[in-house]
Amino acid sequence: MRRTNEVRIVGTAQYYETGGTWQVAGVSCNAFKPDDPNNLVLISEGNKPGYQEVTATDFLEKKVTFEKEDGTLYAKDFADLAMDTSISMKNLYVKRIYTTESDKDTSNGAMTLTCEVDGKTVTVRTNVLFDEDGKKVTQDAFLNKTIDVEGVVGLFNGDYQIKVVALDGITVH
């Protein structure tokens, strides 16, 4: 099971327009001043990651409405606001799988799973996955099966997807 560390980060939140993401800039860790309140600090280790459970409808269709300073309203996709955050989704039926095949690419063996849940199509992208014996996991492990996933919201070719980075991020029913 994956484990994570809890840290305190001090910096400035800024939007990275080229990458289309928010980031924290100005993070520092001064080893000569370990008590500096601006340091990056390890708080705890070995924590189970937190995943916000999301429905397919919310992931694909939900809009979040904001009010601007002038009182006008505008809406953003829930998935856009959830970019690069960890979510989980349950009961996805795997209908198709595309496996990356390229000897020149580190993603050789990574898979794109086209899933259906509640009448909606959700895309799950994996890293190259390995089982406990170090063998590469193939599409046979997931095709025509129902799965639960834990991953990170991403965007590929204008479509939101759930990126799964390790085998324990997928549970087969």
Describe every region a protein language model picked out.
Residues 1-173:
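OB-fold nucleic-acid-binding modules
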